[in-house]
Amino acid sequence: MLLWVLFVILILTSGSHCSLPPSPPFRMQRHVDAIFTTNYRKLLSQLYARKVIQDIMNKQGERIQEQRARLSRQEDSMWTEDKQMTLESILQGFPRMKPSADA
């Protein structure tokens, strides 16, 4: 009796004996689909990574351009101030011309 119960349990739990295996063309089609899907996912991942890297590089490029523009404005401002101070010191070095009585 115990053997009979074990035999029935074994038969019921092993579903592979009851169903037929899939036909080879169907299995090949599934395999081809899986290969395509895997490769397509890899391609999409690479494209996404490339886009993210390009976005990061563009943002860095914009920051560098802003910093250069800011530096250029600061240099222009410093040069203008330096030029103004030089001109003022030159003008202060010249004696002031007073109208002479001879003229």
Swiss-Prot record:
Keyword ATP-binding assigned: no
GO process terms (BP): adenohypophysis development; adenylate cyclase-activating G protein-coupled receptor signaling pathway; growth hormone secretion; hormone secretion; multicellular organism growth; positive regulation of cell population proliferation; positive regulation of growth hormone secretion; positive regulation of hormone secretion
GO CC terms, sorted: extracellular space; terminal bouton
TM ranges: none
Signal peptide: 1-19
Major localization listed first in the record, in broad terms: secreted
Pfam family, one: Hormone_2
Record keywords, A-Z: Secreted, Signal
InterPro entries: Glucagon_GIP_secretin_VIP, VIP/GHRH-like
Disulfide topology: none
SMART domains: GLUCA (SM00070)
Subcellular location: Secreted
Pro-piece positions: 20-30, 74-103
GO molecular function term, any single one: growth hormone-releasing hormone receptor binding
Family label: Belongs to the glucagon family.
Main function: GRF is released by the hypothalamus and acts on the adenohypophyse to stimulate the secretion of growth hormone.
PANTHER family named among the record's database cross-references: GLUCAGON-FAMILY NEUROPEPTIDE, SOMATOLIBERIN
The protein's name in its UniProt record: Somatoliberin
Protein species of origin: Mus musculus
Gene that encodes it: Ghrh
